[in-house]
Design a protein with these regions (language model features):
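Basic phosphate/pyrophosphate-binding loop/patch that engages nucleotide-derived ligands
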Residues: 45-46, 92-106
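Glycine/proline-rich, positively charged
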Residues: 1-82
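Glycine-rich, positively charged active-site loop/lid region within alpha/beta enzyme cores that binds
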Residues: 13-26, 101-157, 179
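Short, hinge-like loop/turn segments at secondary-structure boundaries
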Residues: 70-74, 97-99, 124-128
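Glycine/threonine-rich phosphate-binding loop and adjacent beta-strand/alpha-helix elements that clamp
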Residues: 168
Length: 187
């Protein structure tokens, strides 16, 4: 069996990859309804193939709908959300954190180091050859001037407490009451 089966992306149009604001599209009707998804996942749970379910890259609307349906229709409950969260991307705190805490649906954090920027590897204009930022153009949202200034301040703060930037960033993420796990990986 699979301990935790996570839905990777919502099918419906929503604000992905750091896009601010939601732009509604009346023609966006070709996605599987929330209830149908939960019913499909329930079959796998009933067959013993999956123990728990979660989702990734979800919004407050999506998480709320899943929770409401699981309560009202006796369907499986989402146990986790896997979204980005770090010192420079705290959008999870707007709407999602309250739901996570009140509904006991923990955050599995990805990008706790802002795709490596909070490790300090991009300080002073550095761009390591095989880094994520060098390999994947279009990820520059973590290297904008405002973020770069924040990284310098975090570097000073970490140094003041005899820590690396990565240790500071991970300690911050781990201190949040809605976080249950964080993922880091080398790049």
């Amino acid at each position: 069996y699979i301990d935790l089966y996570q839905l990777h992306w919502p099918e419906r149009n929503t604000n992905f990859f750091g896009k601010h604001g939601y732009e509604h599209d009346e023609n966006d009707k070709d996605w599987t309804p929330f209830e149908d998804i939960l019913e499909s996942l329930k079959r796998f749970i009933d067959q013993g193939k999956i123990r728990y379910i979660g989702m990734s890259n979800e919004t407050p609307y999506g998480l709320s709908r899943y929770i409401e349906l699981s309560k009202n229709k006796n369907l499986p409950r989402m146990m986790s959300v896997q979204n980005p969260y770090n010192l420079v991307n705290r959008t999870y705190e707007i709407g999602m954190s309250e739901i996570s805490i009140r509904e006991k649906c923990g955050l599995l954090v990805y990008y706790p180091l802002a795709t490596g920027a909070l490790s300090g590897k991009y300080r002073n204009g550095q761009m390591p050859k095989n880094s994520r930022q060098a390999l994947f153009k279009g990820w520059e949202r973590h290297l904008n001037p405002l973020a770069m200034n924040a990284y310098e301040e975090y570097h000073k703060l970490a140094k003041e407490y005899n820590m690396t930037m990565a240790q500071l960033a991970q300690a911050f993420v781990n201190s949040r009451p809605f976080v249950c796990l964080l993922y880091t990986s080398p790049s």
